[in-house]
Regions:
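Conserved catalytic or regulatory cores that recognize and/or transform ribose-phosphate-containing ligands
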Residues: 1-104
Length: 104
């Protein structure tokens, strides 16, 4: 199952580390993580609108979305969650998984 990782990137100096930790955790749980932070780093300077178009395309390919802690503070992460729900994607929240719960 492919899972898109969503969380705050702008104004978050630790985003690379947070996304990588989520990626590793998802792999341990036998998910195939899709880490948009890896793509952003390797792309030329893009507008926020261009980045969101890429993110939506990646999200469409996935079976679900994994919401990192603090996602509510990110306009982009909120938009990704809304889009994922409109596509009936499975939604996983980091805070529940940290407590050992397996679902929303």
């Amino acid at each position: 199952m492919m899972i898109y990782i969503s969380g705050a990137i702008s104004n978050n100096p630790n985003y690379q580390s947070e996304f990588q930790k989520a990626e590793q955790w998802l792999m341990l749980k036998d998910y195939t993580p899709v880490n948009p932070a890896r793509f952003i780093t390797n792309l030329p300077k893009l507008t926020e609108e261009q980045i969101m178009k890429i993110d939506y395309c990646l999200l469409e390919l996935c079976d679900g979305i994994f919401m990192l802690g603090g996602w509510q503070k990110s306009k982009g992460a909120c938009a990704e969650l809304s889009y994922a729900k409109s596509l009936d994607k499975k939604v996983l929240y980091q805070k529940y998984y940290e407590r050992g719960q397996d679902n929303e």
